[in-house]
């Protein structure tokens, strides 16, 4: 470290905000949040993410377009270059943890070049009362957004990269201003490590009621994980990343990373109230009075708020609870043919978990050509799961079977027609569906079967118009509905051909005509 460079260790959020303002890294909003702009990368860069290929990962990773291999020697050389760059400038260090279960946490030393990225890290990771009390081997995360990679020299895809090295327990982020890369990289680390310990890592939100009734909400970004788990009547565990171990569900993080597009106090009061001093607002436009305009998408559809769980009044302080009674798969159906809620058998749960059918809504990935497009994302989070999909599906079924959890498919997308002509289910309707699920009011109820979709739908849900429950009722053109439903069933069938699973699971999905 040069004589003029300063290393700031374990600063408070207030101290970091002072540094961020002094360094010109962003602006303080009227509500007290710190607003930062991430430049041309306003989402994750999947083509720039790599995992170092070495003996411990060579035969365990599902290598391909998602998990791209990186040379170990190239990693060492680039890490050394970036580390030297960091040491020559002021930087920030904190001692944090990932995983709220004392049996399954990882200690992480986070080093960042900027103060605002450090606030993000302290918000999103766990700030323990006593760091690494079990003396677990620690990880290092180094985030240096102003470092410019040289692809020919460094072996990267572009001027920025995210590299995960399991053998050395290191994560390198260079040239990446989008802060979400930090949290997702450590999520990927836990997603690789936890299954070996018999723990299912999940891309889901979680909350728990007064009676200890835990509920999980799986889904891609924009499908409702954060909104639906932020329920004023229940205690929040977390909004995005969890582990399901025998006897417990625990948060992998210590904060929330909420989408801000069209955020309103009326529809999302918990999130609204959490955005205050200490919160990071990412790519949010301010008006002339520095009031956030959450309807302004001129920078991106993927504007975000990162805040610590302490900003949520009604939360589970321990960041963990018991095993779930209800498991909800959130799908945003752009074809408009899926019902608002379906009750899944164990086999159907496996089918839909592996399929991960949904839409990219205001995609979190850069380079998305459309703000809404359908997709199949294995385990409702394919970009973050390094092992083969079957590993996670088998663990899910094991947990569901052993604990007797009920599984539901909830459509937060369109009905009455596809995106563009149909109408999206409003938040109050989806909340009523979720309320019925978490309160146990859909257990053992009368259902009707939708043949082409192979789904069982309740004939009545408290607080929901019964005409909405069977989607054919919401379409004026019934023949057009049948056409779209058959097309979706065929898409499911085609997508599922890549999975080598039992006939019971294969036959639990939609039936291509």
From Swiss-Prot:
What reaction does this enzyme carry out catalytically?
A: oxaloacetate + ATP = phosphoenolpyruvate + ADP + CO2
Subunit and interaction comment: Monomer.
The free-text note explaining how the cofactor binds reads: Binds 1 Mn(2+) ion per subunit.
One GO term of the biological process aspect: gluconeogenesis
Q: Which cofactor does it need?
A: Mn(2+)
Q: What are the record's GO terms for cellular component? A: cytosol
Claim: Cytoplasm is one of the keywords in the record: yes
- Which positions bind ATP? 184, 203, 219-227, 268, 304, 430
Residues annotated for Mn(2+) binding in this entry: 184, 203, 240
Q: Which PANTHER family match?
A: PHOSPHOENOLPYRUVATE CARBOXYKINASE (ATP) (PTHR30031:SF0), PHOSPHOENOLPYRUVATE CARBOXYKINASE ATP (PTHR30031)
Q: Which UniProt keywords apply?
A: ATP-binding, Cytoplasm, Decarboxylase, Gluconeogenesis, Lyase, Manganese, Metal-binding, Nucleotide-binding
Residues the record lists as binding substrate: 44, 178, 184, 304
This chain belongs to the protein called Phosphoenolpyruvate carboxykinase (ATP)
Q: What is the lineage of its organism?
A: Bacteria, Pseudomonadati, Pseudomonadota, Gammaproteobacteria, Alteromonadales
Subcellular location(s): the record lists:
Cytoplasm
The disulfide bonds in this chain are none
Q: In which pathway does it act?
A: Carbohydrate biosynthesis; gluconeogenesis
For molecular function, the Gene Ontology terms on record are: ATP binding; metal ion binding; phosphoenolpyruvate carboxykinase (ATP) activity
Q: What is its EC number?
A: 4.1.1.49
Q: Which family does it belong to?
A: Belongs to the phosphoenolpyruvate carboxykinase (ATP) family.
Judged by the first EC level, this protein's enzyme class is lyase
Q: What function is annotated for this protein?
A: Involved in the gluconeogenesis. Catalyzes the conversion of oxaloacetate (OAA) to phosphoenolpyruvate (PEP) through direct phosphoryl transfer between the nucleoside triphosphate and OAA.
């Amino acid at each position: 470290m040069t004589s003029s460079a300063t290393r700031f260790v374990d600063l408070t959020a207030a101290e970091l905000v002072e540094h961020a303002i002094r360094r010109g890294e962003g602006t303080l909003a009227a509500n007290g949040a710190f607003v930062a702009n991430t430049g041309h990368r306003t989402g994750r860069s999947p083509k720039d993410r790599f995992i170092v290929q070495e003996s411990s990962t060579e035969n365990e990773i599902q290598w391909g377009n998602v998990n791209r291999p990186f040379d170990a020697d190239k990693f060492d050389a680039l890490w050394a270059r970036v580390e030297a760059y960091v040491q020559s400038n002021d930087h920030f260090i904190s001692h944090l943890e990932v995983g709220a279960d004392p049996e399954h946490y990882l200690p992480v030393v986070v080093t960042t070049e900027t103060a605002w990225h450090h606030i993000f890290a302290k918000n999103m990771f766990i700030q323990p009362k006593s760091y690494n009390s079990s003396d677990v081997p620690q990880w290092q995360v180094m985030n240096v957004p102003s470092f410019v990679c040289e692809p020919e020299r460094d072996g990267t895809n572009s001027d920025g990269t995210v590299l995960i090295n399991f053998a050395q327990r290191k994560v390198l982020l260079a040239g990446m201003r989008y802060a979400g890369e930090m949290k997702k990289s450590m999520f990927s680390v836990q997603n690789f490590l936890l299954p070996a310990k018999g723990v299912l890592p999940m891309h889901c939100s979680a909350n728990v009621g007064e009676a200890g009734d835990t509920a999980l909400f799986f889904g891609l970004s924009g499908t409702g994980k954060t909104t639906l788990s932020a329920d004023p009547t229940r205690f929040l565990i977390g909004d995005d990343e969890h582990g399901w171990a025998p006897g417990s569900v625990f948060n992998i993080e210590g904060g929330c990373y909420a989408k801000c597009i069209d955020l309103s106090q009326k529809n999302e009061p918990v999130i609204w109230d959490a955005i205050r001093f200490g919160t990071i607002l990412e790519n949010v436009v301010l008006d002339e009075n520095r009031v956030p305009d959450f309807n302004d998408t001129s920078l991106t559809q993927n504007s975000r708020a990162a805040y610590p769980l302490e900003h949520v009044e009604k939360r589970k302080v321990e960041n963990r609870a018991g095993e779930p009674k209800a498991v909800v798969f959130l799908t945003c159906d752009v074809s408009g043919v899926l019902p608002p809620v379906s009750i899944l058998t164990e086999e159907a749960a496996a089918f839909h978990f592996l399929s991960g059918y949904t839409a990219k809504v205001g995609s979190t990935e850069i380079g998305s050509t459309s703000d809404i497009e359908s997709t199949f994302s294995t385990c409702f989070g394919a970009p973050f799961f390094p092992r083969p999909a079957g590993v996670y599906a088998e663990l899910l079924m094991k947990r569901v079977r052993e604990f007797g959890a009920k599984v539901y498919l909830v459509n937060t997308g369109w009905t009455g027609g596809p995106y563009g002509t149909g109408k999206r289910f409003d938040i109050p309707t989806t909340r009523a569906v979720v309320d019925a699920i978490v309160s146990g009011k859909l257990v053992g109820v009368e259902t009707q079967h939708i043949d082409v979709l192979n789904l069982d739908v309740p004939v009545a849900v408290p607080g929901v118009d019964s005409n909405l429950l069977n989607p054919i009722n919401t379409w004026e053109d019934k023949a057009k509905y049948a056409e779209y439903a058959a097309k979706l069933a065929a898409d499911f069938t085609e997508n599922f051909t890549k999975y080598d699973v039992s006939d019971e699971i294969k036959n639990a999905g939609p039936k291509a005509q």
